[in-house]
Regions:
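Conserved nucleotide- and phosphate/pyrophosphate-binding catalytic cores
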Residues: 1-158
């Protein structure tokens, strides 16, 4: 696997439960999958861990709140992020509104990818062509490898 390089900085996508990164081996409700329906994405984002909000102005965010803001940086506009940053720093943040906005922006980000995957999976003829090309390429590579193996072993019968 190759790490996704976003603006020359490696991106760690934080989980929705505030306990590290999103991972298929972790809490299923804290991870957004490209195959998740729009409603499932909204449901998962709305269950993201939050608290009652900051008690004092300009206090540092707890890790689980910082995770939500990191997710927003991946899919939300700069104006949206700035509005919620200001709300947080002024102790007027409404996490329900923040999560609704994040959920909609996440749906808008993931839906086109999911739709493209579904279109590819539903194109049986296209998939057959891809598999045929892959098989031809693998067969060619395997034949070359076997030729080298036979030469190395002195089994050049063909």
């Amino acid at each position: 696997p190759i790490a996704f390089n976003y603006n020359q900085t490696l991106v760690k996508v934080p989980s929705l439960d505030g306990l590290g990164k999103m991972s298929k081996s972790e809490n299923q409700m804290a991870t957004l999958y490209l195959a998740d329906s729009d409603n499932m994405i909204r449901k998962k984002v709305m269950k993201a861990k939050t608290d009652s909000g900051p008690a004092d102005k300009n206090t540092p965010k707890p890790d689980y709140i910082e995770n939500i803001f990191l997710l927003m940086n991946l899919v939300c506009t700069a104006d949206t992020i700035q509005k919620f940053e200001e709300d947080y720093n002024n102790c007027t943040i409404r996490y329900g509104d923040l999560k609704k906005q994040l959920a909609e922006d996440m749906v808008n980000f993931i839906a086109p990818i999911r739709n493209k995957v579904e279109a590819i999976l539903n194109d049986e003829e296209g998939l057959k062509q891809i598999m045929q090309k892959g098989a031809e390429k693998a067969n060619k590579s395997a034949n070359e490898t076997m030729k080298l193996v036979r030469e190395a072993m002195g089994l050049n019968y063909f």
